[in-house]
Regions:
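Intrinsic structural disorder
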Residues: 1-24, 28-29, 48, 53, ...
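N-terminal secretory targeting modules
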Residues: 1-53, 60-66, 218-305
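Short, charge-rich amphipathic segments
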Residues: 6, 10-18, 33-43, 67-79, ...
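Conserved SGNH/GDSL esterase-like catalytic core that processes O-acyl groups on lipids
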Residues: 49-54, 59-134, 162-164, 259-264, ...
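Residue-level marker of intrinsically disordered, low-complexity segments enriched
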Residues: 86, 119, 177, 181, ...
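Surface-exposed patches in mature extracellular/periplasmic domains of secreted proteins
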Residues: 87-93, 154-155, 228-230
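Alpha-helical cap/lid subdomain in secreted, periplasmic
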Residues: 105-226, 282-289, 293, 297, ...
């Protein structure tokens, strides 16, 4: 091969390499864009890594489970890994005795630099009906604002046993936002088993009950993957009061408060919004006198058994 032919061949190879490189760059860019635009259900189908957040009460924490690994969320994590063959991380911030307001606080206070793709929320058992509509919607708004591309699944707790006023309130909020519902009430009722066979204490699902929780959430996910749906509706809030929760500031007792004596703490701060207190669980009555600008604001008492 003479030099002219060699130069021609070299030019052709360079052109081919440049074309292949360009195609690879375009492919990577398209994949990156798809990953950014996909919601949770499409990410599962496309094999992308997903991050799941669980915000619930004691049932969400796996209370009632008799065998480690049988917790509904651990079964779900194992299943999801078989679906997309990629990384599936689950962050569970559920706590026993929590109400919807606590779920809002946990969501807003979470600072782990993870962009969640799916949030599973479940409250109602410990909530009073008064305020539930605002607090539950505050969780939805918190997730929507903090993780704009995050899908939500709402679990209707089997411990309610029927469609109580709390459950109806939650269903109404989910309908408004287009949030898929995992109905463990009907799942327990249609299981062919007595309720006492699914819960040893009448509230928390045992191993058999955990299996039903897992299957119910799994079915919701499978249906949305198959239909390529599941994104929340971009709608206005139902209750305007929910926007009082938009501004969230966490003041920690260890660094923001000044201890005056064994029972008195002071905080110098300027803020507006809904005031809440995070209690340490102590049996009996837990009373706090709250003063704002030197005047008694409120004296709430919380009782823990």
């Amino acid at each position: 091969m003479n030099k002219k032919d060699e130069d021609k061949k070299s030019a052709e190879l360079q052109a081919l390499n440049a074309k292949l490189y360009q195609e690879e760059q375009e492919k990577e860019a398209a994949l990156k864009q798809k990953k950014a635009e996909d919601i949770f259900y499409q990410k599962l189908s496309d094999g992308f890594d997903v991050n799941v957040l669980v915000v619930r009460d004691s049932i969400g924490a796996g209370a009632g489970t008799e065998t480690d690994g049988q917790q509904w969320f651990k079964q779900l994590q194992a299943y999801l890994r078989t679906v997309n063959k990629a990384s599936v991380s689950v962050t569970n911030v559920s706590m026993g005795g929590n109400t919807s307001y606590a779920g809002y606080v946990q969501t807003m206070a979470l600072d782990d630099d993870i962009d969640y793709d799916l949030a599973v929320i479940c409250y109602g058992q410990n909530d009073a009906l008064q305020g539930l509509d605002v607090y539950y919607e505050a969780i939805v708004q918190a997730i929507k604002n903090k993780y704009p591309n995050c899908s939500i699944i709402s679990i209707l707790e089997s411990s309610q046993r029927d469609y109580t006023s709390n459950i109806i309130t939650i269903q109404s909020i989910c309908d408004h936002y287009g949030i898929p519902v995992a109905d463990t009430i009907v799942a327990f009722n249609n299981s062919g088993k007595a309720y006492d066979d699914l819960s040893n204490d009448g509230v928390h699902p045992n191993d058999a009950g955990q299996e039903i929780y897992y299957e119910t959430v799994k079915n919701v996910i499978d249906e949305n993957v198959a239909a390529s749906t599941g994104k929340m509706e971009n709608v206005d809030a139902i209750n305007a009061d929910v926007h009082k929760f938009d501004n969230f500031i966490w003041y920690g007792a260890d660094k923001d408060f000044k201890r005056v004596d064994d029972t008195t703490f002071t905080l110098n701060a300027s803020a507006s919004g809904v005031f809440g207190i995070d209690y340490t669980f102590e049996s009996g009555d837990n009373k706090a006198d709250i003063y704002v600008d030197g005047e008694l604001f409120e004296s709430p008492t919380v009782t823990f058994e």
